[in-house]
Structures are given as structure tokens and as C-alpha cells.
Amino acid sequence: MTTTLVEGSVWQFDLGMVNAYLIDDGEVTLVDAGTPRSADDIRSRMAEIGYEPADVDRVLITHYDLDHVGGIAGLDLDAPIYAREPDASHFEGSASPSPTNRKGLFQRVVGVWVTRPDEPVRRVEDSIGGFDAYATPGHTAGHTAFVHEELRTALVGDLVTGDDGALSTPPLPMTKDPSRNAESIRELAARELDVDVVAMGHGDPVVEDGAAALADLARRVG
């Protein structure tokens, strides 16, 4: 299912177990790309709203997990990929997640199904295009939230989950450092972002008063 979050600019691709997002602010950005089986689905969702993979100008990766980077290879994109360290290195295969915690061990095991990008992943720091890039470590060490204030939209990956307008923390077993993730939630909320939409990797995006929903979660995890 494809859902319009901001008319003419932001779309959610519900890929079943995970979401990806397409943003058009004059440049076309794909945020995350599902599993290795998601590529055809993403291509179909793009076609529904008048796009094709060749239209994508950049890919932003909120974090390195199979269900967020797996579909990129199958899209045959001619676009740079951006991620924060160390997740960028984990995706391109120049470094591996630590096997000393459950999250890293799981990433190493399922990493055999990840097709590495042909070109080096570009490192994102503070911003890219119309997006501010905020470090939100916890779920993974290099987790990043991408915020487009002009479109009043925050794309937060697995920092949170969503259910019927409310936000929750991600499942503890699949989060590298739950305490640090909670701290990242508080830090992002403290920025008092001027956003309506909070769009996450798993669950239903918040489409009204997203900043308030994030602040409410920050109080609950405080």
C-alpha cells in the first residue's frame, strides 16, 4: 500500500514488515529500501505515483539492517547512498558489526543476504539536500534521523515504532543499546522540531502533531 503523508511530496511505501519512503522536494529521495524481496514492490509503488527508480537522486539509509538496505541492489539505482558511520562501513562491507552483543551477532548472520553497493557509501554528517541529519544511536551505533523541516517531516527509522498515532520504543532484543536509544529519543524531542509527520520503519506514521507525540514518548522513557 502507498500512503500520501504530505500531498505531492512525501509517500509511505508499506512493504509488509517494514516501511520505505519517497520524498520529492525538487530532488527525489528514497529513505530506506526494505528487504532483498522488496525491490519489485518498491518499483510498483513508485509507478503508482508516477516515478521510477531512475528518478531517484539519492538514497538515505537510517541504519544498517537487512530490512532497511536489502532492497537497494534490486532497484538498479544510479544514485548515491548516504549513511552515518559505522553503519555505512557495515553496509559496504569494509567493517563488520561487533559479535559481542545480540544485535551485532544477528547483523553478521543475516548479512550474507545483503548485496553490497557497487560504489562506496557516502558518509552523512549534519545535512544532505533539504534534510538535517541527526545522530540517533541506540538501535544501531550509526542510526540517523532525517528531518525535512520545510515538509514538516521527520524520518526516524527504528528509533521508534508507531501504532495509531502513538509512538513506542523499538523491541529491546533487536536494539543494540536500549538505554542509548531512549537517550536519543529524548535528545531528538529536545530539539523541538517543527514537524507534523513522524515516519518510522515499523508501524503507522504519525501525521499530525508529530513533535508532540515524540515529546510524549520522551517523557515516558525519561
Predicted ranges, named:
Residues 39-83:
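Active-site metal-binding motif and surrounding structural segment of the metallo-beta-lactamase
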Residues 2-48, 145-162:
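Conserved beta-strand hairpin/beta-sheet module of binuclear metal-dependent hydrolase folds
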Residues 36-37, 87-135, 141-216:
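Metallo-beta-lactamase
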Residues 25-27, 75-80, 129-132, 149-152, ...:
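Short glycine/proline-enriched coil/turn segments at helix->beta-strand junctions
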Residues 82-95, 150-155:
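Short, solvent-exposed beta-strand-terminating loops
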Residues 29-31, 60, 81, 153-155, ...:
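Residue-level marker for buried hydrophobic side chains located in beta-strands
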Residues 1-11, 39, 59-60, 96-104, ...:
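Haloarchaeal acidic low-complexity proteome signature biased toward cell-envelope/secretome components but also
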